[in-house]
């Protein structure tokens, strides 16, 4: 199976935008929630990202892209099986709100290129340190790029990274109808 996937992957058209590029755009959109609100979503600014996602879904060819009164984004990637066979529908779900505890406004992204190991000090607030002791997974990321905020805001990776992955997957599926 992995050989077939690898061979097929070589013929795939790339998405219009990488997941990382999408993520870097999405984290700059403030979607901070509010604990003291009963409304869903708890802040109107969450619609800013929701409406952008609907626009992008339409541009990449997803059908019936829309946002509900509750800020939930829906879209359909049409089936492409020749025999119109009935197959299970799959939903991909991610939230877009960020923590009310830390600001999500004016996010400044820092990309730590080719991480060399050790603790990561956030540049605008040196008291904010991601330590190897508390985050031992850093040991596995040596040589990779690590994305953080500058220490003055929340990055919003939970779960804008998930949204970026879902949007990139939809883009890839729409550009590659040979995928079944």
Residue spans for each PLM region:
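Bacterial N-terminal signal peptides
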Residues: 1-4
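Generic structural signal for well-ordered, non-membrane alpha-helical segments
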Residues: 12, 16-19, 42-46, 50, ...
């Amino acid at each position: 199976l992995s050989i077939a996937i690898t061979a097929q992957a070589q013929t795939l058209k790339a998405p219009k935008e990488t997941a990382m590029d999408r993520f870097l755009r999405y984290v700059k959109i403030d979607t901070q929630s509010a604990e003291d609100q009963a409304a869903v979503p708890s802040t109107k600014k969450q619609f800013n990202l929701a409406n952008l996602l609907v626009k992008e879904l339409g541009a990449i060819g997803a059908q019936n892209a829309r946002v509900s009164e509750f800020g939930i984004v829906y879209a359909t990637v049409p089936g492409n099986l020749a025999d119109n066979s009935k197959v299970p529908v799959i939903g991909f779900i991610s939230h877009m709100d960020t923590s009310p505890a830390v600001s999500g406004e004016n996010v400044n992204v820092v990309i730590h290129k080719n991480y060399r190991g050790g603790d990561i000090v956030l540049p605008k607030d040196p008291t904010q340190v991601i330590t190897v002791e508390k985050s031992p997974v850093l040991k596995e990321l040596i040589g990779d790029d690590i994305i953080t905020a500058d220490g003055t805001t929340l990055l919003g990776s939970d779960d804008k990274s998930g949204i970026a992955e879902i949007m990139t997957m939809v883009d890839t599926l729409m550009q590659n109808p040979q995928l079944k």
